[in-house]
Amino acid sequence: MEAVILFPAIDLKNGQCVRLEQGDMARATVFNLNPAAQAQSFAEQGFEYLHVVDLDGAFAGKPVNAQAVEAMLKTIKIPVQLGGGIRDLATVEAWLEKGITRVIIGTAAVRDPDLVKAAAKKFPGRVAVGLDARDGKVAVEGWAETSQVTALEIAQRFEDAGVAAIIFTDIARDGLLKGLNLDATIALADSISIPVIASGGLASIDDVKAMLTPRAKKLAGAIAGRALYDGRLDPAAALTLIRNARAA
């Protein structure tokens, strides 16, 4: 089957590695004071691609935790995709030059779709769109505001733009270990040609198994956060499952 990727997540707040519940900055749990050490740990566990979000940046509209991100890039060799506060072409370019493999544009994808198109054209394969939905509608500004458009409506705007992936997050499940919203994610993946990555709520090896079933064949991967930090998801078991599925 196609190469499905399990991305371990590092969310940055005040230079620390945290997990939020439903995107609420007041409900942040610090899991590691040293994000670079956490990144190194994930790389050593065998993960092949890291997912990083600058939470402060998402709220500020510009990069805030650049120092922590740069420390990670110096520490690990695996590719990193980064979101949070990326709202203009200059920021996209700056991060890619610093060694980020793929940037994720969220709020600006809703507010300024031309930015995504310009960035994807200039940097083919290196621009992803982050669509975070609450009750089907896309939320912006670090999830502080909910728009009136659906994830599918926005995703369709980028069908021919050369976007590398869409990261679809179900806010209601994020950080709560309730399981991925595979129904909504698969429905989105089946409606567009852009690869879709599932995010929000991954709770156990069962989610990884579900992601590898025939009905989820269009999914490009999933993001694991709290389940890894809480020890509910064994990295070795999850990665072995994925490797075996690839070989099948």
Swiss-Prot record:
Gene3D superfamilies registered for this protein in UniProt: Aldolase class I
EC number of the protein: 5.3.1.16
Pathway: Amino-acid biosynthesis; L-histidine biosynthesis; L-histidine from 5-phospho-alpha-D-ribose 1-diphosphate: step 4/9
Keyword Cytoplasm attached: yes
Keyword field contains RNA-binding: no
Alphabetized InterPro entries for the sequence: Aldolase_TIM (IPR013785), His_biosynth (IPR006062), HisA_bact_arch (IPR006063), Isoase_HisA-like (IPR044524), Isoase_HisA-like_bact (IPR023016), RibuloseP-bd_barrel (IPR011060)
GO molecular function terms noted in the UniProt entry: 1-(5-phosphoribosyl)-5-[(5-phosphoribosylamino)methylideneamino]imidazole-4-carboxamide isomerase activity
Active site: D11, D132
Similarity annotation: Belongs to the HisA/HisF family.
Protein name listed in UniProt: 1-(5-phosphoribosyl)-5-[(5-phosphoribosylamino)methylideneamino] imidazole-4-carboxamide isomerase
